[in-house]
Amino acid sequence: MARYRGPVEKLERRFGVSLALKGERRLAGKSALDKRPYAPGQHGARKGKISEYGLQLREKQKAKFMYGVSEKQFRRLFAEAARREGNTGVLLIQLLEQRLDNVVYRMGFATTRRFARQLVTHGHVLVNGKRVDIPSFRVEAGAKIEIIEKSKNNPQITRAIELTAQTGIVAWVDVEKDKRFGIFTRKPEREEVVIPVEERFIVELYSK
């Protein structure tokens, strides 16, 4: 299944939670979810009972759409998490958080992961001084992530940094906003990653 490219606000209304897909509109309380907090469609406001499988699938889809990964990428990450020693669900979240596009977003250089992915693919991001244009590139602890010199005054990046001042930066990165670089200091603990996803249902889904 390819990466979703449709109307992102419909996804948030379908799931009933913010997936951080519309950064500035969400912060301003102007997103479609804020205005219409129910699923789109004629019967969107109705709440039906969801099956166990439906719940498992729902959590997987939320994670996929939030991090902007395809089904193939998601399965590959889950398989890697399952092979490692430890809690598979927690390891999966950590692997998703280590994606370069996500780290750029977490550092506050983009209002959404989608824009962060564009910054990476268009060559605006350096990792340890080298240009990397692969959004799925895995960032390891201690890596320096920097916006290239000619893009440091990009108005969208500047606006993202201004908005980040309202929400704060996550604990596992250190950022020099004025210099447009940051350090990915460590992998996050699960309780630090505030996302509307219950990964245990994803583990149950793929363990069948």
Swiss-Prot record:
Biological process (GO), any one: translation
SMART domains: Ribosomal_S4 (SM01390), S4 (SM00363)
Gene3D superfamilies: Ribosomal Protein S4 Delta 41, Chain A, domain 1, RNA-binding S4 domain
One Pfam entry name: S4
InterPro entries named among the record's database cross-references: Ribosomal_uS4, Ribosomal_uS4_bac-type, Ribosomal_uS4_CS, Ribosomal_uS4_N, S4_RNA-bd, S4_RNA-bd_sf
Keywords recorded for this protein, A-Z: Ribonucleoprotein, Ribosomal protein, RNA-binding, rRNA-binding
Domain S4 RNA-binding: 98-163
A Gene Ontology term for the protein's cellular component: small ribosomal subunit
UniProt keyword annotation of Nucleotidyltransferase present: no
Cysteines paired by S-S bonds: none
Domain of life: Bacteria
Annotated GO MF terms: rRNA binding; structural constituent of ribosome
Assigned protein family: Belongs to the universal ribosomal protein uS4 family.
Function: One of the primary rRNA binding proteins, it binds directly to 16S rRNA where it nucleates assembly of the body of the 30S subunit.
Subunit structure: Part of the 30S ribosomal subunit. Contacts protein S5. The interaction surface between S4 and S5 is involved in control of translational fidelity.
NCBIfam families: PRK05327.1, rpsD_bact
Name of the featured protein: Small ribosomal subunit protein uS4
Lineage per the UniProt record: Bacteria, Pseudomonadati, Campylobacterota, Epsilonproteobacteria, Campylobacterales
Gene label: rpsD
